[in-house]
Amino acid sequence: MSSGKITQVIGPVVDVAFAAGDRLPEINNALVVYKNDEKKSKIVLEVALELGDGVVRTIAMESTDGLTRGLEVLDTGRPISVPVGKETLGRVFNVLGDTIDLDAPFGDDAERQPIHKKAPTFDELSTSSEILETGIKVIDLLAPYLKGGKVGLFGGAGVGKTVLIQELIHNIAQEHGGISVFTGVGERTREGNDLYWEMKESGVIEKTAMVFGQMNEPPGARMRVALTGLTIAEYFRDVEGQDVLLFIDNIFRFTQAGSEVSALLGRMPSAVGYQPTLATEMGQLQERITSTKKGSVTSIQAIYVPADDYTDPAPATAFAHLDSTTNLERKLVQLGIYPAVDPLASSSRALAPEIVGEEHYAVAAEVKRVLQRYHELQDIIAILGMDELSDEEKTLVARARRIQFFLSQNFNVAEQFTGQPGSYVPVAETVRGFKEILEGKHDKLPEDAFRGVGSIEDVLAKAEKMGF
């Protein structure tokens, strides 16, 4: 194990010099620095660049407070390695695989794997055309998720990405009972804490491993924490042969941390100030999140859209890797429609008759057509009023408004805020409900009866309460 000495500390960047003739650590190797002689408090560094003359530039995974020039640095000879396997379920980790949930830490004999690996080879990959039922109507009908696919939840600030991810975790754990890995990347610590206690109360935590590198962490930790969560998920896929759900909130913060690290390393910025290696870094992460012949990883990633600009390089780079996109729209939030999923902008590779079936596909296509036509007529209605429309157009507008409200529903995880019980709607019920609205069976019911409900039976019950 070779050792060097710290020559420079600039925030999270630490330069380490190794003696002439010593073997230099490889890129991505983990180095360890002990702050004092007792060797109780250590800081992990990751090698990022070789500067020449035996000097390497590293990024710290923790705060560099207390580091001084001349401190000894040890090369571990391998990348950061984190615990894997069934023992990780029910536990909360940081980027280094250390437990942060106050329970007993993992011993040195626990099985660990490095966070840097190659993506599966082409002949190991597997494709599936099975739908993952979420119980959320707007997703299941118009942008269904594939088992083993990649899903992006796009949206600006405060439109409901995290709540939607929490509802998906709740529904999938309750209805499907699969193993989940939740990775919090550069998001609010409070939200992570709330999620942990909610999952503990509901019992879902027993089938979930949680990894956090939140907003207050150095950029190195925020950049690598997604790989820590992915490594845990890969073990369940490759060794245990399981179907795993990987939740990442938020993939934009991964890009943002990469941008900070790139600037700290002195690289010339690219478009909009992002790192020149943006596409490479995103590709290295996304290519590992895939399904193989041994098992599958279904990933659901929240992606923050800066200033609601979808052409920003960060969300635009992520788009290329996804099977389904769920776009959250601020205008729908203003209308009080939750989840605020834009039915026309959201898309899925799975919405094809050979995957979802002829009836589902036909109903989804007709719902989109009606909503698109309503969208086109809104300018006429705003300027001239409803009276200028033909009878056929008036009927279409009335049905479109009912469809728009019926696409909303109350969430189980938001019950404490709304006071309304959440609902899980099976796909068959969803398709039947929208088919009946399109056929005009519920034209006489008030629009308000369709807002925030589950199945079409709930609409009828709500209308009855309203006196219809």
Curated annotation (Swiss-Prot):
Catalytic activity: ATP + H2O + 4 H(+)(in) = ADP + phosphate + 5 H(+)(out)
One cellular component (GO) term of this entry: proton-transporting ATP synthase complex
MF terms in GO: ATP binding; ATP hydrolysis activity; proton-transporting ATP synthase activity, rotational mechanism
EC code: 7.1.2.2
Residues that bind ATP: G155, G156, A157, G158, V159, G160, K161, T162
Membrane topology reported for the UniProt record: Peripheral membrane protein
Principal cellular location given in the protein's record: membrane
Keyword vocabulary terms for this entry: ATP synthesis, ATP-binding, Cell membrane, CF(1), Hydrogen ion transport, Ion transport, Membrane, Nucleotide-binding, Translocase, Transport
Locations listed in the record: Cell membrane
Pfam families: ATP-synt_ab, ATP-synt_ab_N, ATP-synt_VA_C
Keyword Transferase on entry: no
SUPFAM superfamilies in UniProt: C-terminal domain of alpha and beta subunits of F1 ATP synthase, N-terminal domain of alpha and beta subunits of F1 ATP synthase, P-loop containing nucleoside triphosphate hydrolases
InterPro entries: AAA+_ATPase, ATP-synt_VA_C, ATP_synth_F1_bsu, ATPase_a/bsu_AS, ATPase_alpha/beta_chains, ATPase_F1/V1/A1_a/bsu_N, ATPase_F1/V1/A1_a/bsu_N_sf, ATPase_F1/V1/A1_a/bsu_nucl-bd
SMART domains attached to this UniProt entry: AAA
HAMAP family given in the database record: ATP_synth_beta_bact (MF_01347)
Role summary: Produces ATP from ADP in the presence of a proton gradient across the membrane. The catalytic sites are hosted primarily by the beta subunits.
Subunit structure: F-type ATPases have 2 components, CF(1) - the catalytic core - and CF(0) - the membrane proton channel. CF(1) has five subunits: alpha(3), beta(3), gamma(1), delta(1), epsilon(1). CF(0) has three main subunits: a(1), b(2) and c(9-12). The alpha and beta chains form an alternating ring which encloses part of the gamma chain. CF(1) is attached to CF(0) by a central stalk formed by the gamma and epsilon chains, while a peripheral stalk is formed by the delta and b chains.
The family this protein is said to belong to: Belongs to the ATPase alpha/beta chains family.
Name the record gives this protein: ATP synthase subunit beta
Species: Streptococcus gordonii (strain Challis / ATCC 35105 / BCRC 15272 / CH1 / DL1 / V288)
Name of the encoding gene: atpD
